[in-house]
Design a protein with these regions (language model features):
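NAD(P)H-binding glycine-rich loop region in Rossmannoid oxidoreductase-like domains
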Residues: 1-24, 38
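Active-site Tyr-X1-5-Lys
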Residues: 31-34, 73-110, 129-140
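Alpha-helical substrate-binding/gating segment
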Residues: 112, 127-145, 155-192
């Protein structure tokens, strides 16, 4: 099972609808993961988000940085829901991994872009918003584009097709020995960053 379903949106949507973002994502994750287990699914891959990491995390982000500091306030409810999904997979592995031979994993993609993206400036993510702003400015012959923020945050981007390849590869080729390269202290760890840094 590949669990990619989620309520998603950009900064404005996250700020305006925090209850929807935490509630709907918690419901999706619990229902799908529990139903997968109840149906005898042995392998599940849950797609999280890089927003699970603290606001001031060092770059490139490492898996061990999870829960090491405060989250970005604008998307904290969404991030908390995604962290709960990770912990749910980890808990299923801890409780049922050996007895039921299950392996529920999580991938944390970077900022995605590609076909089918949402270009509505009120709900889009950063790449689609930038493309839309620059496209509109070009069409109106404007010489300047106003972007949000200070310009200092670092972002890593990944094409959605590359994530698709990574998802298939990880679920089909996951080797428990890979675990020792992520976080040695937690044998039940379920998550792996994809498309971040070089490690």
């Amino acid at each position: 099972v590949y669990l990619a379903a989620a309520k998603v949106g950009g900064i404005l949507a996250n700020s305006k609808y925090p209850a929807d973002f935490i509630g709907q994502n918690l419901s999706i994750q619990l229902n799908v993961i529990q139903s997968a287990f109840d149906s005898g699914v042995k392998k599940l891959l849950f797609l999280g988000s890089s927003c699970i990491y603290p606001k001031f995390v060092s770059q490139p982000i490492n898996e061990k940085d999870l829960l090491s500091g405060p989250l970005e306030p604008t998307n904290e409810p969404y991030a908390i829901a995604k962290i709960a999904g990770i912990k749910l997979c980890e808990s299923f592995n801890r409780q049922y991994g050996e007895s039921h031979n299950i392996d529920y994993r999580c991938l944390m993609p970077t900022n995605l872009y590609g076909p089918g993206d949402n270009y509505d400036l009120k709900t889009s993510h950063v790449m689609a918003a930038l493309v839309k702003k620059f496209s509109d400015a070009k069409a109106r012959n404007e010489l300047k584009v106003t972007c949000w923020g200070s310009g200092s945050p670092l972002r890593e981007f990944m094409h959605v097709d590359d994530l698709g390849d990574a998802v298939l590869f990880v679920l089909e080729n996951w080797d428990p020995e890979m675990q020792k390269f992520v976080i040695k202290e937690n044998k039940y760890l379920t998550y792996l960053n994809v498309g971040t840094g070089k490690d």
